[in-house]
Regions:
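Accessory C-terminal segments flanking Radical SAM cores
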Residues: 137-178
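Conserved glycine-rich "GG(E/T)P / GGGxP" loop and the immediately following alpha-helix
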Residues: 1-133
Length: 178
């Protein structure tokens, strides 16, 4: 029913899409039907899913590397190494990869360390862009403000109208079809 109405199918919303065992099949099916598939992930399951994901070859994979900040005691060096091993391989295969640091105005204190870890795998200089850097062909680092899910109970804006701006030109379908 979506054919002819939309171009892009984004496989993300709430939760980690790489947990779904049929994700690569969904990507292939989307491509066969003429859609442009994009995946957004926190990157923690890339190693386990790399071969099937690379074979499915989505148009773009966005990796929210800022998500690692919430994992106290986790190994950032190992995490970034795994993300970069996957990302450089994917980019070489023609998949656009965006490493997202969407934490401005929040927990951005570790960003310089993360950028140093990325530079171990793709040395600088990088090409500056309005939203970050192009660090190699098909491989980008992007910055943006910290995203906070709308919450009517939030004390700062509980009396205001809460609205997700993405709903102006996007819809989301959860795993249960809602």
């Amino acid at each position: 029913r979506l054919k002819g109405r939309i171009k892009f199918l984004y496989f993300h919303l709430m939760g980690e899409p790489l947990l779904h065992p049929l994700l690569p099949a969904f990507v292939l099916s989307a491509k066969e039907k003429g859609f442009i598939p994009v995946i957004t992930t926190n990157g923690t399951l890339l190693t386990e899913n790399a071969a099937r994901l690379l074979d499915a070859k989505p148009h773009k994979i966005q990796i929210s590397i800022h998500s690692h900040e919430g994992n106290e005691g986790a190994d950032p060096d190992g995490y970034i190494a795994r993300v970069m091993n996957f990302s450089t391989d994917a980019a070489e295969r023609g998949i656009i990869v965006v490493l997202r640091l969407w934490n401005q105005g929040g927990y951005e204190r570790n960003n310089e360390r993360i950028l140093q870890l990325i530079a171990r795998h793709v040395p600088r200089p990088w090409t500056e862009r309005y939203d970050g850097w192009k660090i190699s062909p098909n491989l980008y680092v992007e910055f943006d403000k910290m995203f906070e899910w709308p919450d009517e109970g939030h004390e700062e804006y509980a009396q205001e109208e809460v609205f997700c701006y993405a709903l102006r030109n996007q819809i989301g379908v959860l795993a249960d079809g809602t």
